[in-house]
UniProtKB/Swiss-Prot annotation:
This is Pyrimidine/purine nucleoside phosphorylase 1. It catalyses: a purine D-ribonucleoside + phosphate = a purine nucleobase + alpha-D-ribose 1-phosphate; adenosine + phosphate = alpha-D-ribose 1-phosphate + adenine; cytidine + phosphate = cytosine + alpha-D-ribose 1-phosphate; guanosine + phosphate = alpha-D-ribose 1-phosphate + guanine. Gene3D superfamilies: Jelly Rolls. The lineage of its organism: Bacteria, Pseudomonadati, Pseudomonadota, Gammaproteobacteria, Moraxellales. It is an enzyme of class 2 (transferase). HAMAP family: Nucleos_phosphorylase_PpnP.
Length: 111
């Protein structure tokens, strides 16, 4: 699991917001050129069955708070993840995520 805080980073103050504000994230940039995003996803409801996210590069999504179910493109079923667990999505792919509670995450851009 990743540390609860990062040092010596630059933070993009402009959030990436999707699904009418239900999902938001901020990008942090490290001195060595690495990027990560830190985000929050609000619970699904009768208006949103699940969220879909596309990837351009390989991403490791680390759940830091809450729990959710994820179905990566090409998989047949959803898999369960909770705080302390992570999953990998290849580049040029995507995944569906559904949750009944607030989920916090770190997206490690690995590609």
């Amino acid at each position: 699991m990743t540390a609860a805080q990062f040092t010596n980073v630059t933070v993009n103050a402009q959030a990436t917001i999707s699904y009418d504000g239900r999902c938001s994230s901020h990008t942090i940039m490290f001195e060595d050129g690495r990027h990560k995003t830190l985000g929050v996803i609000l619970p699904c409801d009768n208006l949103v069955e699940h969220y879909h996210f596309s990837t351009n590069t390989s991403e490791r999504i680390e759940i830091t708070g809450g729990e959710c179910e994820v179905k990566i493109n090409g998989e047949e079923a959803f898999s369960y993840y909770r705080a302390g667990q992570s999953f990998v999505v290849e580049g040029n792919s995507g995944f569906n995520l559904r949750t009944e509670e607030i989920v916090q995450y770190i997206c490690h851009l690995e590609g």
